[in-house]
Every structure is written in C-alpha cells, then in structure tokens.
Regions:
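NTP-dependent small-molecule kinase module
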Residues: 1-4, 23, 27, 73, ...
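Hydrophobic anchor at the beta1->P-loop junction of P-loop NTPases
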Residues: 9
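P-loop (Walker A) phosphate-binding loop of NTP-binding proteins
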Residues: 12
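Walker A/P-loop
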Residues: 18
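Short amphipathic alpha-helical segments
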Residues: 22, 89-92, 112-116, 161-162
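ATP-dependent small-molecule kinase phosphotransfer cores
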Residues: 31, 35-95, 120, 128, ...
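Short glycine-rich anion-binding loops that position phosphate/pyrophosphate groups of nucleotides
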Residues: 82-85, 106-108, 154
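A glycine- and Lys/Arg-enriched "phosphate-lid" helix/loop adjacent to the NTP-binding pocket
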Residues: 97-140
C-alpha cells in the first residue's frame, strides 16, 4: 500500500462495499475492516437485532464511536455501513484524513439487491418508492466523497481495478 491513509468505501446498502473492500484489501495486502461486522462482534448481535432490541439511536451512537476510533488507524481498507457517511462527524473525519470512494450503483440494481433482505433493517419495511427516496437523499451526501465509482454494468474485478488505479496515483 503506497499511502498510509485508509481507503474508505461508502455507498448504499447493497452497493458491494464489503465484497469490494475485501478484494481490495487482498490486492493491497492490508487489513479489511467492515464496520457493520465490527458492530456485530462488539454487540454479539446481528445488525437487524441491534435495531430491533436497542433501537436506531443506540446503533448510530455506537456506529459513530467505533467508526471514529477505527478511522484513526492507518493503512486499512474500511467499509462504512450504508448510513455511516451520513453522520457529519464520521464524514468530516473520512474526508479529512482518508481516501474515500463512493460505490455509486443504479437505483434499480440497489432495489433488486436489498428488497426483502432481512439483514437490512432500514430497508426491510420500506416500499420501493420509499427506498428510492432514501437512495436519492443519501446520494447527495455520498457525492461528497473524493472519488465516485460508477458501478453499473461493471464486474467486481473492474470496480477493484478502477479503485486501485485511482488510489495508486495518490
């Protein structure tokens, strides 16, 4: 890994952050940190259980605390949860000291990937139109990332290559 800065992946649930992050970390031979997985390890609960048993406020507070701590590490590939970058403190820290990549996916692709997925607590009870509205709202914030990767019609390998090419020049 050329830089000591973290490579951060942001985007909607279902955009492929965990999959792409894992592949990039293997290519760069660095640690991969999936924030949602860390939250599950810390709470000993699945994300959907945290939402059901503790509520969204508890989840967001814990997500902020853990994410900010992990963003102070270096030389990692980190996948934020879908709502992580929406948090202003997290977003500011990501933009200040890291390389951020937004995995921008076609709305219909995202709808197909996340529809009726029980492990996606925010999306589970939303209609297609409500999900589309959520995607549009988050897109405005995701667009603040340093780099935008349009993932539509790209394979996982092509996405990884695009990110590594950009990352290698910084």
């Amino acid at each position: 890994m050329k830089s000591k800065k973290n490579l951060i992946l942001i985007g909607m649930m279902g955009s492929g952050k965990s999959t792409i992050g894992s592949l990039i970390s293997k290519e760069l031979n660095v640690k991969f940190i999936d924030i949602d997985s860390v939250l599950e390890d810390v709470t000993k609960m699945k994300i959907v259980e945290i939402f059901e048993k503790k509520g969204e406020n508890f989840f967001r507070n814990l997500e902020e605390k853990i994410t900010l701590k992990l963003l102070n590490s270096t030389n990692n590939v980190i996948s934020l949860g879908g709502g992580g970058f929406i948090n202003e403190k997290i977003r500011n820290e990501v933009l200040k000291n890291n390389f951020s990549f937004w995995l921008n996916c076609d709305t219909q692709m995202l709808l197909n990937r996340i529809k009726n997925r029980k492990k996606r607590p925010i999306a589970f009870n939303l209609s297609d139109s409500e999900l589309t509205e959520l995607i549009a709202k988050r897109t405005k914030i995701y667009s603040k990332a340093q780099f935008k990767i349009n993932c539509h019609k790209l394979t996982k390998t092509e996405i990884v290559k695009k990110i590594l090419k950009i990352y290698g020049h910084n």
